[in-house]
Amino acid sequence: MKELELKYGCNPNQKPSRVFMKDGRDLPITVVNGRPGYINLLDAFNGWQLVRELKAATGLPAATSFKHVSPAGAAVGLPLTDIEKKIYWVDDLGELSPLASAYARARGADRMSSFGDFIALSDVCDEDTARLIKREVSDGVVAPGYTGEALELLKSKKNGNYCIIQIDPEYVPAELETKDVFGVTFEQGRNELKIDDELFSNIVTENKELPESAKIDLAIAMITLKYTQSNSVCYVKGGAAIGIGAGQQSRIHCTRLAGDKADKWFLRQSPQVLGLPFKEDIRRADRDNTIDVYISDDYEDVIGEGEWQKYFTEQPKVFTREERKAWLKNNTDVTLGSDAFFPFGDNVERANRSGVKYIAQPGGSIRDDIVIETCNKYGMVMCFTGIRLFHH
């Protein structure tokens, strides 16, 4: 297939729309089911690159959950704890395959943002992963292949219209890439930068103890940032991105946004949230929305009189701000990556409040000394990578 006609571009008024290969080669994808849209394919190609690089860097199956050309989550296939199974709504599925575990983590990091996602998988989609995808609200999936059982499950989604794309894992794009804006063609070399342990060798803080687990998490953070709209900051713990701040104009807003998401991920693991007495017929998306409000200062919107009856069998107790702060102090050894340098120490101060201990950023600010000093104050380990990872 040399070109694929699309229903429309970014918006319904943008017609005609298609994807094709300028060099006349066949497209590196096969549409197995459904009809992908313009933004679906942007998510698919960015997501595929992300999971392919995660697999190469860690040796583990990888998955990402994309929305509007940025990842909402990304993870590798490490086993899930019992608590993680509960907060990702997979505790009823038994033991999951590594690939399914990766997607459960990627989807579960920021379930509000992942609603209606486009999924990318590094490995052949197996039955476990398909069963997990089937019960989530999702636009589509891209993978290098699918088992027969997985295809049968996925094709039953969205009344048979779920978008399933198979990508050629051997496809290598041209070294130069182009795009047109306002009738002007932009050309640049592809960002083929390889992210591995060597990137984290320049440790500039007093604390220089960087365990292997932190190196894996830093690699996940930096690879995730490589395919996230800039400016961006990514918090990672235990093989999964737990907070991604994408597309912000200031670095501190990235750090705050990603930190707030990481905090919500950890608050979901608290006894107060795990013990919420939900009605049995409450849908998964409604549970996610309710939890998101419950752990905020707007909790009265879901537990106030006349409201709690919609969601719960009995009125939950308030999860106070003081209780939330106390719980968040238990979140430790979080890693953080930034796609460009920290211009001020305020980013480190905010990161510290979300349990960050390991940081990777390019360095190069005129205030590097202040940023390093702030890290030293908290005993953090910070690497200067010397590379910027802007993505647009």
Stretches with model-predicted labels:
Residues 53, 227, 264-268, 353, ...:
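Conserved helix-loop functional segments at active or binding sites
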Residues 70, 125, 237-240, 248, ...:
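Active-site-proximal loop/turn and secondary-structure-junction residues that shape catalytic pockets
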Residues 57-65, 164-167, 230-237, 267-278, ...:
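Flexible, glycine/charged-enriched surface loops at secondary-structure junctions
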Residues 220, 228, 235-238, 245, ...:
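Nucleic-acid 5′ end/cap handling module spanning
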Residues 72-111, 242-341:
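Glycine- and Gly-Pro-enriched alpha-helical subdomains that act as flexible
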Residues 1-199, 214-232:
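Active-site loops and adjacent core secondary-structure elements that bind or stabilize anionic groups
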Residues 72, 117, 121-122, 135-165, ...:
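C-terminal binding/interaction regions
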